[in-house]
Amino acid sequence: LLRYSNPIITADYPDPDVIRVGKDFYMVSSSFNYFPGVPIMHSTDLVNWELINYVIAEPVAGFNKVRSGEGAWACSIRYHKGIFYCLIPFPDEGLFVSVSIDPYGKWSKLKCLYEGKGYEDPCPIWIDDKTYVVFAFVKSRIGFNSKLGLIETDETLSAVLSDNYSIIYDGTEKDQTIEGPKVYKIGKMIYILAPAGGVEHGYQVGLSSRSIMGPFRRSVLLKQGDNGINGPHQGALIDIDDKKRYAFIHFEDQKELGRVVMLEPADIDCNGNIKLGINSLPVRDGVVLTKEDARSIDYSDSFDSDKLSLIWQTPAIVEAGWINPSKNGLVMNSRFQSLDDFISFPYRLCQKVSSYHQKASLILDLFLDEGDKMLFGIIGRSYLLIGVKKSRGKLYRIIATVNQEEVIDEITGTNGIILDVKYDYPNLCSCSENKKSVMIDKEHWTGLHYCIGLITHNSSSRGFAVLKRFTISK
């Protein structure tokens, strides 16, 4: 057996959903306004995960600007009759579907299944000859929450057959903010697992019935204990083999770092009761399947491919041509923005901060025009950036935060420039230049990312940089 320690993924992969197909496990998670959207990961042991693809590869209307926190919320993945289905909510647009016969291959363009504001966390289920989708509600969009809704669809999730949604569970009294439902049919029973009570201090609710319409028997399956693991939020029940063995994967809120992924033991007893964790409490360590040819997410990048590594995303849809990957480095072209605001700047490569304590270094060659700023750093709802700007014909090394830009020194060389930043959990970002550090707080930082961008105030700039290597170290 493989021993593991939680979290199994120390990076911001919120709202994970996981399925098993044969000996393979596939995970999807929320991506919000980052594109490509909805990452897909693969594992053979539930502990070691490799990033293999994204569901959303094509542009989505309305996301050519940075819309922080919007976009693709908690999705679900299912496998039915040889087809992978991913059901994705956009809280301001509706519930969307993408399908594929190969999770490593091309996924279909998003199709709206159920249009409207305020629907979130959809999960499909096929029961006998009918197909249903269970979902939750976003109070800020629709005026209420704490309820679970249901619609009937055709078998391929192409059309809604219901005249309207039905409320199948009302958690207003016992389970405030119940959301994130995942629905399963095991034997003759229907099970819905859903978190309630809020992200940081909530618990996992189990609902069971012989009918998708209820009535449901309610129980609390997983709750916060005294071992420092906060509210066990939404996730997935997984049948880990054909021997009726189970596991549960969920996220835990880790402040500025984001929502990390946790693995819990699970079981269904002879009376059909689901058991999660140990005595309904999350675990720090456990054992699971035998380790098989384990791979992991590679966060470093040598920029020696003509394709961009899967680890990089952008915070909005941007046009092709602003970057050009090659075997000799990745060329990043400058892009104009009048405001000196890096958060709203869409032309930046981003990847998740992936450890409680780590250093990230970027090596690059610079070919800047007047008014260009090459910036690298850590960004959430605020940022700490180190970089180089060209002003009055000279190059200056700079450090920038939201409210301040500081010139460190003038530089003369343009090749082999090294920029580095460091993150120390829970609330410190720093860079070695001038030993600059910034205390961060969750009001302004969430789901931290490393980011790289070349912004300019010169509308005729033809400046560019060649990225040579990005390295993660302790």
Where are these regions (language model features)?
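Carbohydrate-active catalytic/glycan-binding domains of CAZyme proteins
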Residues: L1-K474
